[in-house]
Amino acid sequence: MSLKFIPLAALLASFLPLIAIGQDRTYDLYVCAAVNRNYVIGSKITTTSGLHLRQANGQWAHVGINDPSIFAVSFDPRDHNTFYTAALNGALRTVNGGDSWRVTTSWDITEPKDVCVDPHNPDRVYLAHPGGIAVSDDRGMTWTKRERGLPDRGKYTQTIEVDRSRKGHILAGCESGIYLSQNDARSWRKTLVTEETVNDVQQSPHDPDIWAAVTQSAGAYISRNGGRSWTAFDQVPSEAALYNIAFDPTNPGRLAIGSYTYGVLASEDGGATWKPRNEGLPKPHRIWRVGVDPDSGTLLASLYQKALYESSDFGKTWKKAGLEGSAINSFVFLPNSRK
């Protein structure tokens, strides 16, 4: 499947006729994906990596620059033509839907792993990177490190999320645990101690007090008080890495975990019990990331350098959904203007 480089503004306009005759989705799905199976330096294979947008007909279109190192993307809720990516060479920003880009960080902030626009103050952007946490209060023009309360050793930060219901509350997943800030990242306190890196932290779309987290090899956890304390999911294995966790926005009891070792793990009772949901997926079940479509409840799973797969019954059966040869680093569902 060929992928085209198309500016986002033009891309959205071109989709309107397709949307009219296709499924009326209220969310657009973006993925950050490296589509580079079998590629080596010097190879003549053409790859198209970076940000991809699912079209109304189910096909995928490339948006912006060709970069296999884009780990995450976050949009300005006031203007979806403005968004930020976390990539190998720093935090990048576009203000014209991906037509042009600017690296906004300097030499001392590289290889960020996650980026998050503050929904309470969209001029503020948070960045998780190997050296800790950085914040911009001017839409990425300048960055300040905000690490008070983080340890000198163990502040490598993999993921960062802003509490959508509490202004100033942020949760960060670091190599030494989960840290909570209640003052716009001016200070941090540890609320979960782990011996391995916290790979993902997510807030429930149903109850803002509920958060879930997964780790490199220290299991998975749930918080029912806004991240102030955590309890382990007893039935989730902890011997190997868990890459991410996703809530089902259409069903409060459903959660899914993606793991390179265990494949897809699913719960339909709020995390009390978990089952592998790999039947029908190619072996080995090397799941890179999972996501859940807020329009349909469709479970999505990225098989490392294989393809994207989808399930309409939360993992009991699967079918291929494109992006051959890809490894998806993140799923982002963005409310669209047709909502």
Please report, for each region that a protein language model flagged, where it lies by residue.
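Extracellular glycan-interacting surfaces
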Residues: 8-12, 18-339
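Bacterial N-terminal signal peptides that target proteins for export
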Residues: 1-8
